[in-house]
């Protein structure tokens, strides 16, 4: 890599998205495409990202960061307004994300996160509506895309299974 003019990053997954590769390239002075290591690392932390964008006037659903153990689940379920979106604090691709509409679903979602090794989650107010994504590149917005899953919500399976979701451009 030391002779590379530039590294074109086309990575997916925790090591490719959490800033580690970017930090290594920056440490060696190798130019690369995409966000720097700090931006990548921050974006993986859902609570930190929300706290940083709120003062900029970017609205997100109400949320709370919760660290818990198995024995805390009954009280947490009792104290949480439903429906709620349960998200592991760190990570991407909607891995481990659930929408809980009942106490049983919330219990299962919290247990799933613990099974994945995530004892800290973001509990986010559920907002129903259309899912529309708009990418931003340098100084311009890209065309909007409406995403319509064939079933459920736009979770990991619907993102990566061919034909599981319809994408309409422009939205």
Residue ranges and their predicted role:
Residues 30, 80-82, 138-140:
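Short glycine/proline-enriched coil/turn segments at helix->beta-strand junctions
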Residues 1-62:
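Conserved N-proximal alpha/beta basic substrate-recognition cap immediately N-terminal to
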Residues 1, 42-130:
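Active-site nucleotide/adenylate-binding loops and adjacent lid/helix of ATP-dependent enzymes
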Residues 101-171:
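Phosphate-binding site of ATP-dependent enzymes
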Residues 30, 91, 159-162:
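Short connector loops/turns at beta-strand edges and beta->alpha or beta->beta junctions
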Residues 34-35, 94, 166-169:
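Short small-residue beta-strand/loop micro-motif enriched in glycine and branched aliphatics
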Residues 18-20, 95-96, 133:
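Short glycine-/acidic-enriched loop or helix-start segments at secondary-structure transitions
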């Amino acid at each position: 890599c030391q002779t590379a003019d530039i590294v074109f990053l086309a990575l997916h997954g925790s090591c490719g998205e959490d800033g580690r590769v970017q930090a290594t390239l920056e440490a060696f002075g190798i130019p690369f495409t995409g966000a720097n290591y700090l931006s990548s690392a921050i974006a993986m932390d859902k609570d930190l990202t929300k706290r940083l964008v709120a003062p900029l006037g970017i609205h997100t659903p109400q949320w709370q960061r919760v660290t818990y153990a198995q024995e805390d689940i009954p009280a947490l379920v009792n104290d949480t307004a439903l429906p709620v979106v349960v998200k592991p604090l760190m990570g991407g691709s909607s891995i481990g994300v659930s929408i809980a509409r009942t106490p049983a679903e919330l219990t299962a979602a919290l247990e799933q996160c613990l099974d994945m090794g995530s004892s800290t989650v973001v509990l986010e107010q559920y907002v129903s509506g259309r899912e529309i994504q708009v990418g931003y590149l340098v100084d311009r917005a890209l065309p909007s895309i409406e995403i319509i899953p064939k079933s459920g919500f736009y979770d990991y399976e619907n993102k990566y299974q061919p034909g599981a979701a319809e994408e309409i451009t422009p939205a």
